[in-house]
Amino acid sequence: MFERLDLMEAKYDELTQALASPEIVNDSAKYQKTAKAHAELTQLVQKYREYKDLTRGIKDSRQMVAEETDAEMKAYAQQELTELEQRLHAVEEDLKVLLLPRDPNDDKNIIVEIRAGTGGDEASLFAAELFRMYNRYAETQRWKVEVLSSSESGVGGLKEVIAIIEGRGAYSKLKYESGVHRVQRVPQTETQGRVHTSAVTVAVLPEAEEVDIKIEAKDIRIDTFCSSGPGGQSVNTTYSAVRITHLPTNTVVSCQDEKSQIKNREKGMRVLRARLYEVEQQKQADALAKERKQQVGSGDRSEKIRTYNFPQNRVTDHRIGYTVHQLSEFMDGKINALIEALTTHYQAEKLKEQTTAVS
């Protein structure tokens, strides 16, 4: 591990010098590439340097404990040594996590698909609330949200919404949101105060570039139709809405939010690429899981991942047993604590798998 860290620190120093080189500074493409590589190593190298500082401090403290004759000073040195050793252990664990192979999709933009499931109007209202929650969280991260396609319900909810979220680390933060989100509450139309249960499905897909997934023109069929609003009524007399069918997989994407057919087609292709890319990623994950003879983090969308219980003012994530009691704040986009808990959990799982594989 430490030989690898030494090599990475040397690479970091090399990149630091390169960023000051006129040859790099005057070439925008080279500078961006070098700066990106430098940024990816910064946290790891800083943590490794902290580790080395702590080991030097421990060496000095041990020497002081061994040589000190004054009882009070010896006790002070021993206390300091214990604290340094505890910090060293924590930093070493951090280094192990930072050395885990990065998910190549972590820095990608994402396509978020939210669909109302069981529960009728109540499910559509909750779908709209979830979309607002992700919007508010995106604002805190300074990400850009753009709706690609949406279908409203007659009560002001959303039957479906597909949006792209653009920003650094979007996939790394929201990739664990895929699955079934269950809501328990008393609908406004309920006269007897009974709690109803509804469900909404969320899918988070890394946006695929054209280099990630190639789609041949012969493999798609594009149909055009008039845009429609809630209830199916036509809202546009021109054929601006598009339906794209990927013939080999029978994957269908519809987009009608823009008045321009060209823009709807562009948005539809972005969604199609993301869905086909996810299929390829899932095939690879399934093959890897089969090889290991165990299912490894499939992110199954049919899995119930979270329950939002309004009468009890709590949110529970069933995968890690994490409960939040400030439901209104959570729905207002304050979801970072849960995101960090999920990230820590799955990093620990990866470490466990890595340790098992080595042994």
From Swiss-Prot:
Its job: Peptide chain release factor 1 directs the termination of translation in response to the peptide chain termination codons UAG and UAA.
Gene Ontology molecular function: translation release factor activity, codon specific
Alphabetical list of NCBIfam families matching this protein: prfA (TIGR00019), PRK00591.1 (NF001859)
Gene name in the database record: prfA
Upper lineage: Bacteria, Pseudomonadati, Acidobacteriota, Terriglobia, Terriglobales
Top-rank lineage group of the source organism: Bacteria
Chain positions found as N5-methylglutamine: Q233
Pfam families reported for this sequence: PCRF, RF-1
Subcellular location: Cytoplasm
Keywords of the record: Cytoplasm, Methylation, Protein biosynthesis
Annotated protein name in UniProt: Peptide chain release factor 1
GO cellular component, one term: cytoplasm
Description of post-translational modifications: Methylated by PrmC. Methylation increases the termination efficiency of RF1.
Family: Belongs to the prokaryotic/mitochondrial release factor family.
Protein's organism: Koribacter versatilis (strain Ellin345)
SMART domains the record matches: PCRF (SM00937)
